[in-house]
Amino acid sequence: MFYKIFGWYIILINVLGFFLMGRDKHLAKAHAWRIPERVLLSVAAAGGAFGSLLGMQIFRHKTKHRKFKVGVPLLLVLWIVLIMAGDHFLITTSRYKVTSEKLPEDFDGFTVVQLSDIHIVRSQFQYDEILRKVKKEKPDLIALTGDLVDAPGYSKSNGTNTELTVKLCGELAGIAPAYYIYGNHEMILLDDPEKNPFKVAVEEAGVKLLNVKAETIEKDGVTLNVCGLQDPSILYKDPVLSQYNDNKSRIEAELDIALAGLDTDNFTLVLSHRPELLDVYAEYPVDLVLSGHAHGGQFRLPVGRCGLIAPNQGWLPKYTSGTYRSSNGGTEMIVSRGLGESEIPVRFFNMPEIVSITIKR
């Protein structure tokens, strides 16, 4: 909620900055009462620097005044740095409610916390914040939807930079059953898939690896299904799934394997790293998909859900953050903006998030 309010504030203060520059220019031409310079600068300093600068250029106003010519661009740079710093260090919790008649009454109010795209826990502060916010949600299940490691950093450190990440996994598994699927960055773990020290450490910490697998969660004699898929880009090393040449057919093969033997009349939750494959998931009896990978589109507008760029979706991606419904209407998907960064180590109006989903009947 704070982030939405802040987004609208930034939009409105910049509209005000633009309007005041235009209005003051009009008053100057009319030789009428002028808007005090301290007011114009105060609006820029309060977050309206972009609108003020745009107004200066369009209305050709104050462009020769040093305090405006230099001051307003500096204020704009300062605000950009502050917003990017906040989007790097702060973490928000996004809460969603999902309803389904397939959910047994005993599971009504079942809470899932999703953590995605951590790309290695990088500081004690991040570790503490994630843990504190997860505990606050009191989850019944924790879903780690890929890219728990960061491939470039893992390679450079030979896997020695994962201590805090493994420790966090142990803490999470102590809060609620925790399930982990591979994203594309887990490709680095596949050179020795069974004996990789990170994989072994995470499983020993109590997290269940759910790649191309499913589990049935039982409560008072009723059940729901949790199914995990690994990222299709890394299936070329799988002796069975490597025969498929495209992501769609690989995901279909994974779903065939993972859902086999399940009672799909039960509510079925799927963990999969790739949001752009929503309509493929919807070809199967899948009720809810939790996904990530898009990093929120990296750079976002202050309000709305439009991101700039995402892997495997390109520019102006469709699936970046929040809830989506498949074309056939049968499957809902929630996409996390993630908690870390990798190749593009910056965010803008794109705060890292923990996702908390309450499933209601």
Describe each region flagged by the PLM.
Residues W8-F19, V43, L74-L78:
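Lipid-exposed faces of alpha-helical membrane segments in multi-pass integral membrane proteins
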Residues N196, V200, E204-V207, K219-T268, ...:
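Binuclear metal-dependent hydrolase catalytic cores centered on His/Asp/Glu-rich metal-binding motifs
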Residues L115-H119, G146-L148, N184-E186, K213-A214, ...:
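Active-site metal-binding loops of divalent metal-dependent hydrolases
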Residues F89, D106-L210:
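Membrane-embedded segments
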Residues L78-T111:
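Acidic, histidine-bearing metal-coordination/catalytic regions of metal-dependent phosphoesterases
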Residues T99-V113, V207-K208, A214-G228, D263-T264, ...:
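Beta-strand-turn-beta hairpins that frame and shape the catalytic cleft
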Residues V200, L269, R274-S356:
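Conserved beta-sheet core of the metallophosphoesterase superfamily
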Residues V39-Q57:
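Hydrophobic, aromatic-rich membrane-embedded alpha-helical segments
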